[in-house]
Structures are given as C-alpha cells and as structure tokens.
Amino acid sequence: LKLPSFPIGQIYGLSFNDDNNRIAMTLNSSRSPGDVYVLNIKNKKLTQWTKSEVGGLDTDNFVSPELVRIKSYDDLEISGFLYLPRDKKGPHPVIISIHGGPESQFRPGFSSRFQYWINELGCAVLATNVRGSAGFGKTFVKLDNGFNREKSVKDIGAFLDMIDKDNRLDSNRIGVYGGSYGGYMVLASMTH
C-alpha cells in the first residue's frame, strides 16, 4: 500500500472506521500541537480534519527541524533535531535542549518554547538524543546506566564539536537548557 506523504511528526491514536476503509489519526508536528487526519485507504487521500489553535500565531512562521546524526567521541552514532531560523542570516546562536528521563526521547513534535526561541530570539535549537535515550533499542537505552552516566555528558561535547563545524551556527554563543534529568545534564555539561 503506497501512502501519501505525511507531514513530519508523530502519529498516534490510529482508529479504523466500521467499514475498515478509512483510518483516523492524530498528528503532532513541529508546526501543530495535534490535528486529526483521515486517510482514505481506497483512494489514498489524506485529509486534515482539524486545525489546532495556537493563540493566533501564524504557523507559517514555525519551522520544522532537520534530523542530524553524528558520531560521538567513541564512534557511537547519536542524533538530534536541529531547528534553524527561517530567512535569517547566520551564524545563529544555539540553544542545546536536553530532554528529561534519561529514558525519554526528543521527537519532532510541537514546542511553543522552541518556536519562540527560533522566531523571536533568532536562535537555532538543537534537541539532543544522547546515549540512554529511549527509542533506539534496548542496548542504546542502557549505555548511560550507572558509572556510564558520564558518557552521555561526553555526547554533549560531540554536539558542541558539530556546532563548531557548522557555519550556520555560532559556536561562541551557546546556551544549554533542560529540566529534571536534562537539568542534571546541563549542570554536568557546564562543568566538563
């Protein structure tokens, strides 16, 4: 079954209709906090049924991230999502965002905070998935357990190296943000 292209985001809440010829789903993307879409299986047409309220803001100004994959200090592949200001000259200051958990994961979902930083402050945002993040397999999620916790801090160092090599980003203007476990990682990153 060849499907139409979907907006980049998270799909959840799948439900078939009684005749099993349509699938309803919720899509949360970087440009929308959650809308209902229906896919007609016969004609493969995807229809958006709702348009989420975002406080009167123009969602055309919201940006979608690009997936970045890098090698960490020990050649382990780690990833994140890089959000860049639209139509603004760089290099951009960068806010590195570290998720809580540690067994959580950044996905390209809606974040009013990120969109504010990008559109109002002109900052790029790098939402990181260091070792120990969920969604990359059982082995990956255990890579920061116990005495290995410091390895995830070194992953932030690898992202700093990436920023330094990317001419769209200003490696002299970097902030680090996180709450809960992400807050621990902010403090640990700043002391290394």
Question: What kind of region is each of these model predictions?
Answer:
Residues 183-192:
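Short glycine-enriched nucleophile-adjacent loop
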Residues 7-9, 27-35, 106, 132:
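A flexible loop/linker signature enriched in serine peptidases of the S9 family
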Residues 23-24:
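Hydrophobic beta-strand positions that form the internal "hydrophobic ladder"
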